[in-house]
Amino acid sequence: MPNRDTQSQNDTPRHSPEAAEPQRDSLFAAPIAKLGDWTFDEKVAEVFPDMIQRSVPGYSNIISMIGMLAERFVQPNSQIYDLGCSLGAATLSMRRNIKAEGCKIIAVDNSPAMVERCRRHIDAFRAETPVDVVEADILDIKLENASMVVLNFTLQFLEPANRQRLLNQVYQGLRPGGALVLSEKFSFADHNVGELLFNMHHDFKRANGYSELEISQKRSMLENVMLTDSVETHKNRLHQAGFEHAEVWFQCFNFGSLIALKAGEAQ
């Protein structure tokens, strides 16, 4: 079997349009007469890489650090889950960095458009660790033999009543010594802090080329489907699920990521 230390060299792009420069997001550049709720449809999937880079501060840092965390936490002969995988950025980052042998990544999303493009994106790169891309509701996935689970800006789109249930399932499916990475947009009890970080995020999007119209229309579409929680709420849920350790490891404005650890020695 090939040496895992050479995997980063093996995870190289094939000739594929999925590895090309992302298409620029201009979905909301013109006024939309009737704004519905946000959906991850074909139009969004087409511009998603550009959209998320220009909308989520620190996104590229989180993605690269997820790879480093995978190198540390992924155990031999285990499974890794990317729940709400979108186009597979976190999956690819983990696959580039996994050194343990006998592993498989299971990437799950409920958007047909995202899943189709994710499969093409994953297939555009060669690597040793196999990836299964699954179109499904993440609540219906039975997590087994997991050493690492990623929820990268996914939980906030789940009905609040189902969030504890999902975290319980993640904890039960993790091996001892396993890790969950939970990235989210945060809300804040302190109104002044929340308003400051909201405005800084607004400035970030403006600096990345979004107009006031684009920012406003996208926010209107998201407000009923992306419901954010405070860091304290996330920690309480994680502890209730059984995680012995949970802490924020990255934050930029009102976006950040927590890591939650299941106690015990890695197997």
Swiss-Prot record:
Reaction(s) catalysed by this chain's protein: prephenate + S-adenosyl-L-methionine = carboxy-S-adenosyl-L-methionine + 3-phenylpyruvate + H2O
Domain of life from the UniProt record: Bacteria
GO terms for MF: carboxyl- or carbamoyltransferase activity; S-adenosyl-L-methionine binding
Pfam family, one: Methyltransf_25
Composition-biased stretches (Basic and acidic residues): 12-24
Keywords, comma-separated and alphabetical: S-adenosyl-L-methionine, Transferase
Enzyme Commission number(s): 2.1.3.-
CDD domains: AdoMet_MTases
Residues noted as binding S-adenosyl-L-methionine in the record, renumbered to the chain: 59, 84-86, 109-110, 137-138, 152, 219
Keyword S-adenosyl-L-methionine tagged: yes
Top EC class for this record: transferase
An example Gene Ontology biological process: tRNA wobble uridine modification
Region (Disordered) location: 1-25
Coiled-coil segments on the chain, per record: none
Segments of skewed composition (Polar residues): 1-11
Gene3D superfamilies from the UniProt entry: Vaccinia Virus protein VP39
Claim: Transferase is one of the keywords in the record: yes
Family: Belongs to the class I-like SAM-binding methyltransferase superfamily. Cx-SAM synthase family.
Assembly with partners or alone: Homodimer.
Function per UniProt: Catalyzes the conversion of S-adenosyl-L-methionine (SAM) to carboxy-S-adenosyl-L-methionine (Cx-SAM).
Identification of the protein by name: Carboxy-S-adenosyl-L-methionine synthase
Organism: Yersinia pestis
